[in-house]
Swiss-Prot record:
Disulfide bonds join C81-C196, C213-C221. The gene is PRL3B1. This is Prolactin-3B1. Keywords: Disulfide bond, Hormone, Secreted, Signal. GO terms for molecular function: hormone activity; prolactin receptor binding. Residues 1-30 form the signal peptide. It comes from Mesocricetus auratus.
Length: 221
């Protein structure tokens, strides 16, 4: 028989999740050491990328359940992702036509565009009335994963393409909406952030699988 989670066991579960994430993140960020080969670093980054997208999907589910029902669907059409201005490959053919250096750089650009938003997202979630521990924990963990993934990719870029110049990334201006006293504006901001983060982590995950196949397995995968 499966026992319900008591407050203590629930806290323990969150702690185990946080520790698991910390160890995975540490594997990536400690990779500046020559002891971790580029092959192994790529493997760590791809694993982290998959976990990051999975977590982003869960965070979007949280936001959708909390804010989605009160949102006018017509209004959502007016809100685009702040990363939409970044020119990214949009289908399999375009991905395979993009050389590895450019694909890696655009992947970094997408993640860099989320560097500030995920930090503000955690603060905004923490300030929401009635926020559950689980929802806040997932938001914090997602921030750590995005930042860890970004750091790991920068290391890979410097190793494989030394001297490569990173692309510019898109400025995010959504902080005021997350803090808005207008509930509808705030709800749309949270919903849009969750939807766009899920979309972009999926892109990143797909790009990294292609890059790993090219750079590590010489397309034999």
């Amino acid at each position: 028989m499966q026992l319900p989670l008591t407050p203590l066991s629930f806290s323990g579960t969150l702690l185990l999740m946080a520790m698991s994430n910390f160890l995975l993140w540490e594997h990536v960020t400690s990779s500046a050491s020559p002891r971790l080969s580029t092959r192994n670093l790529y493997q760590r980054v791809v694993e982290l990328s998959h976990c990051t997208h999975d977590l982003a999907s869960k965070v979007f589910t949280d936001f959708n359940m909390k804010f989605g029902k009160s949102i006018c669907r017509q209004k959502l059409m007016l809100y685009t992702c702040h990363t939409s201005s970044i020119p990214t490959p949009e289908n399999r053919e375009q991905v395979h036509q993009t050389n590895s250096e450019d694909l890696l750089k655009v992947t970094i650009s997408v993640l860099q565009a989320w560097e500030e938003p995920v930090k503000h997202m955690v603060a905004a979630v923490a300030a929401l009335p009635g926020t559950s521990d689980a929802m806040l924990s997932r938001a914090k963990e997602l921030e750590e994963r995005v930042l860890g993934l970004l750091e790991g990719l920068k290391i890979i870029l410097n190793r494989i393409h030394p001297g490569a110049v990173e692309n510019d990334y898109t400025f995010w201006s959504g902080w005021s909406d997350l803090q808005s006293s207008d509930e509808a504006t705030r709800n749309i901001a949270f919903y849009t952030m969750g939807r766009c983060l899920r979309r972009d982590t999926h892109k990143v995950d797909n790009y990294l699988k292609v890059l790993k196949c090219r750079d590590i397995h010489n397309n034999n995968c």
